C-alpha cells in the first residue's frame, strides 16, 4: 500500500514540475577527450596573463641573459596544459578533432548533415 501511494505521489509531482521543452539534457561532454580539452581551455585562460608577461621577458633582447634564463625557468615551471598550443578545436556534437568548421564548431560531417536537413538557419546547399 505504501509503495502504491509513493508511486502515485511521484507521478503527480512529475506532472507538476515543468520539464525542458525538448527533453534533452546537455550538461555532459561527449567523451573524455572533450572534457580534457575543456580543462586545457580553462587552464590556458587562467594562466594567459602570467604567461604573456613571462614570455615578453624571455624574448626581450635588451634585458641581461641571466634575467632571460630566470624567465625560461619560470615558464617551464608553469603547467603544460596552460599553453594555448595544446588546445584543439573539436566538434561539439561528436568531439571529432579534424575537419571542424570553426564558425559553427561542428565537424564537416555533422555540418553537412544538419545543413541538408535544414537545421542550420541561413545555410543551404549551392545550386547553379
UniProtKB/Swiss-Prot annotation:
Keywords: Disease variant, Mitochondrion, Primary mitochondrial disease, Ribonucleoprotein, Ribosomal protein. GO terms for cellular component: mitochondrial inner membrane; mitochondrial ribosome; mitochondrial small ribosomal subunit; mitochondrion; nuclear membrane. One of its GO terms (molecular function) is RNA binding. Its main location: mitochondrion. SUPFAM superfamilies: Glucocorticoid receptor-like (DNA-binding domain) (SSF57716). InterPro entries: Ribosomal_uS14 (IPR001209). Pfam families: Ribosomal_S14. Transmembrane segments: none annotated. One of its GO terms (biological process) is mitochondrial translation. Component of the mitochondrial small ribosomal subunit (mt-SSU). Mature mammalian 55S mitochondrial ribosomes consist of a small (28S) and a large (39S) subunit. The 28S small subunit contains a 12S ribosomal RNA (12S mt-rRNA) and 30 different proteins. The 39S large subunit contains a 16S rRNA (16S mt-rRNA), a copy of mitochondrial valine transfer RNA (mt-tRNA(Val)), which plays an integral structural role, and 52 different proteins. Interacts with LIAT1. It is linked to Combined oxidative phosphorylation deficiency 38: An autosomal recessive disorder due to mitochondrial dysfunction and characterized by perinatal hypertrophic cardiomyopathy, growth retardation, muscle hypotonia, elevated lactate, dysmorphy and intellectual disability. Belongs to the universal ribosomal protein uS14 family. This is Small ribosomal subunit protein uS14m. The lineage of its organism: Eukaryota, Metazoa, Chordata, Craniata, Vertebrata.
Amino acid at each position: 500500500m505504501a509503495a502504491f501511494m509513493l508511486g502515485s505521489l511521484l507521478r503527480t509531482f512529475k506532472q507538476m514540475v515543468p520539464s525542458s521543452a525538448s527533453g534533452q539534457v546537455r550538461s555532459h561532454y561527449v567523451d573524455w577527450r572533450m572534457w580534457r580539452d575543456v580543462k586545457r581551455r580553462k587552464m590556458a585562460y587562467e594562466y594567459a596573463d602570467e604567461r604573456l608577461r613571462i614570455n615578453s621577458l624571455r624574448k626581450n633582447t635588451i634585458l641581461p641573459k641571466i634575467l632571460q634564463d630566470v624567465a625560461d625557468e619560470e615558464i617551464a615551471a608553469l603547467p603544460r596544459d596552460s599553453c594555448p598550443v595544446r588546445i584543439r578545436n573539436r566538434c561539439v556534437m561528436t568531439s571529432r578533432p579534424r575537419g571542424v568548421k570553426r564558425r559553427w564548431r561542428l565537424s564537416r560531417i555533422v555540418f553537412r548533415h544538419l545543413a541538408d536537413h535544414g537545421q542550420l538557419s541561413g545555410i543551404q546547399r549551392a545550386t547553379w
